[in-house]
Amino acid sequence: MTWGFGDCQYRVVESWGKGPEGRRLGIVSSIATDAQDRVYVIDREPNPAIVVFDRDGRLLDVWDQDFLKVPHSIWIGPDDRVLITDCQTHLVYEFPLAGTVVQTWGTRDEPGAPGKPFNQPTWAVFAPWGDLYVADGYGQNWMHRFSADGDLLNSWGGTGSEPGQFDTPHCVKIDPRERVLVIDRGNQRIQVFDKAGALLDVWSDVLSGNELVIDANDIIHLAEAENRVSLLDLDRMVLGRWGEKGDAPGQFVEALHGAWMDSHEDFYICEVPFTPNRLQKFESIR
């Protein structure tokens, strides 16, 4: 059976990451791949760790990091720098692929004041021009921008539904036009900003989005909590949707939370909040 829409067609790889050499996962909240297409999964609960697989689902490594409490998101850049947000410690960590922290942002175990970093940060990315963008989405509704040297440049947002305000800014990504895309989950929209945080556009017609990835053809794949993936172009047009509720391979039991696409355009999805081991690989067949 195939899944997808239009030219974006996939075949689910059953039991990926669950073989005899694999590790039984708990609640998985986020996923990313490196330049070699190794797959890094946040195993959030009950024992926080970063679990590493090869692209065929064979276990390679486990980063059992005592300082991780409630890791929420993982992002890996083209230079293989790794960013992880931790909601409980109010920190953003930067790793190399070796798994040793090289830098942190925030103050451990101290939530930031309103409008200040961080209070349960949800997502972080480096932009191609070097700035760091952090969605501070669970404890407050702000976006923060840092220089490549780690200096806070500016913050924007605040709680509300007006353009530029947020209700759970859950994920941030940079698109090929160098725009900052923020999934404003509670307001069921994507807000588009320039590099400095000036509002450019507001995209509605989404359902509780959690993460987005952009493929080589500039198609946005938006993982939504309502058991579906929406496909959009960079001009906000909805191209199609796919997804089906259920527990069979290829179906979705819970809220789609983490998504990533590797260099082969294979698509990875993980689900939260209550079903363990909900990680699926969809192999591209287009």
Locations of the language-model features?
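Eukaryotic scaffold repeat domains enriched in small/polar residues
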Residues: 1-286
